[in-house]
């Protein structure tokens, strides 16, 4: 089984997770608080900021033809209204490097991290973010749009609602357990395994009493509204309006650029009695966004596992289920199921912008890729317009609050020397095109 040359087959990263020294971002501030929920700070990350050419060359030499990466808003606009020409030139060089090597750049304008100044202005619960994000988008596209064919405005726009639901449930259980002097019914690890991003719920709960004061000092508010904060329904709509405003700016400057958003989507399955949970959760994860994305050129589908519901709600994986380092069930068939479900309502193109596995055994990674890509091919054979697949991630990188403990990468990175080591899975993925 192979894909034709028009299919975009590649890997993905995000700026903060690989570049290093993203000192003007909200995450950098949070990582370096005394009572941080992060296992460790990002620091130099993978030094991709300086080594991008080496990394893109490794991607290309393995046979891959696409690279999804993000532009860091906090680098471009480190202070409100002040744009850094040197940083936009850096991203121009990254894009040109892709072009010279025959790799399609798929650019994301916001991948979780924001400038610290934005959070001080109210962050992602303030309507001001719509104007600010549109202005940033306009600047980037004016400078780089002539080199781009695909732009994702916002990564996993629905993540805030997913985190809100999980954090609320975990907080309630933790408080109940505290009152009863018993451990929570659901451990922090189990809660973390239900969301497609690296979170430390246990540590967040332990640090809560300290973090309010530290956040007040850092951001001017005890509860900073970063992009990856538990989001209100009103904040959810603000994110979608920011997407639409950014899309308008892109199309005004370069109408031919293909514009979309990416969503974190689980393969939702029901056992007896769980059907209503599945319907309600799919509505929250996907359906209610349709009015805001129905005219987009493509949707970025991001999937890692399935979620099973029974009569009393979400079920933990079976005892004999194989889990990843992230506590996800290893279930690569989920991707095909999600693509088919999305295609029922969304009529634009589909690009798998993230799909991967955090594990040390690379043979298991190769098998996961085999099964996931078979599902993609099945969808294409049924005339579903899947235009690309980007494995997460190109490099073993900074998995947010989990630090460097999660190994998603096709390429290993020595934490002391930054030396890259290609895993067999890199060329295994490249063999499909």
Predicted stretch roles:
Residues 1-56, 60-65, 70, 76-433:
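Non-catalytic scaffold segments within catalytic domains of secreted glycoside hydrolases
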